[in-house]
Amino acid sequence: METFLYTSESVNEGHPDKLCDQISDAVLDACLEQDPDSKVACETCTKTNMVMVFGEITTKANVDYEKIVRNTCRNIGFVSDDVGLDADNCKVLVNIEQQSPDIAQGVHGHLTKRPEEIGAGDQGHMFGYATDETPELMPLSHVLATKLGARLTEVRKNGTCPWLRPDGKTQVTVEYYNDKGAMVPIRVHTVLISTQHDETVTNDEIAADLKEHVIKPVIPEKYLDEKTIFHLNPSGRFVIGGPHGDAGLTGRKIIIDTYGGWGAHGGGAFSGKDPTKVDRSGAYIVRQAAKSIVANGLARRCLVQVSYAIGVPEPLSVFVDSYGTGKIPDKEILKIVKENFDFRPGMISIHLDLKRGGNGRFLKTAAYGHFGREDPDFTWETVKPLKWEKPQA
């Protein structure tokens, strides 16, 4: 049996780039909560003792940007300079303007267009992916890397591992078998965790705690064997972290946000963008399409691409690839996709209820992945029933 190795990585909520994603989405939530028609393009950057939010926002909402920044940093655990940032004493810079009137008239006609007439907020192409290798219909390498990161945060916040600090990264290598185009995971080959820690803990304690409290609860036993390799804080020291260790920027973790390197990516980031931005809404609807294809048994693995032109509602192209796992030809799957999914941005917004902010809805997406999550707010994870005829044997 010929196998291959494939690797996906993830980062924690305290990673500087992810901190920026979460601040940008917390701003989006606050705008949409008061004004569902808010137009938001919010970027964040951070470095030692400083956070800056900048971009274009047109909204009727009354938003205290500085308060949102400080609350988001505090909730993650950035409460003193030792851990990488002090939420209550860092500098917060705000440089936000209105959306360009040129873009506004072309996309939503200054809010006069009907939903089906709303044009794409920009050009671009987005991909959705699904695979039957996990219950979430997501790649196992990505699922495990993501869950290890989420578990690190959990044991830090619940006090199980009090030596943990907010920043950290995970990476998982899985050995796979290619079953006629479908991916079958056989075992976990390598687990890598690099986590920020305090001054007091030894490397041996770090390794023991990570194995017992992070790896064991997350990675199913059937995937681990005596040959599995563990790299636990391989650099030997990671006390300085967060924005003190590295600068951070919104939109720098787009593969972690999606499929861990599987499928494909059009390059557009998600966080801080309202649903007229097809980078986000387009990627969400094609995930729903790909997931529905696999869940309905049309294929074991599937990639869907959609593309747009600024100001034009209808997509320029839709593409489906079942990697040879389709029960019917890809062109027939494509026909089913076009009949069941409306790719116009205004209609995506309605069908996936994307104008609803508040309740940390988009903030939740900004750490530990936008896809494969069981949460009613992740409306794009709902499987649509698709009618199709099984070919006669």
UniProtKB/Swiss-Prot annotation:
Where along the chain is K(+) bound? 43
Q: Where does L-methionine bind?
A: 56, 99, 246, 277
Gene Ontology MF terms in the entry: ATP binding; metal ion binding; methionine adenosyltransferase activity
| Role noted for this protein | Catalyzes the formation of S-adenosylmethionine from methionine and ATP.
Q: Where in the cell is it found?
A: Cytoplasm
The protein here is known as: S-adenosylmethionine synthase
Q: Which E.C. number(s) belong to this protein?
A: 2.5.1.6
Gene3D superfamilies membership: 3.30.300.10
Matching entries from SUPFAM superfamilies are given as: S-adenosylmethionine synthetase
Alphabetic keyword roster: ATP-binding, Cobalt, Cytoplasm, Magnesium, Metal-binding, Nucleotide-binding, One-carbon metabolism, Potassium, Transferase
Q: What gene is this protein translated from?
A: KSAMS
Q: Which cofactor does it need?
A: Mn(2+); Mg(2+); Co(2+); K(+)
| Reaction(s) the record says it catalyses | L-methionine + ATP + H2O = S-adenosyl-L-methionine + phosphate + diphosphate
Q: How does activity depend on pH?
A: Optimum pH is 8.5-10.5. Thermoalkaliphic enzyme which tolerates conditions from 6 up to pH 10.5.
Does the keyword section mention Magnesium? yes
SUBUNIT field: Homotetramer; dimer of dimers.
Residues bound to ATP are 15, 167-169, 235-238, 246, 252-253, 269, 273, 277
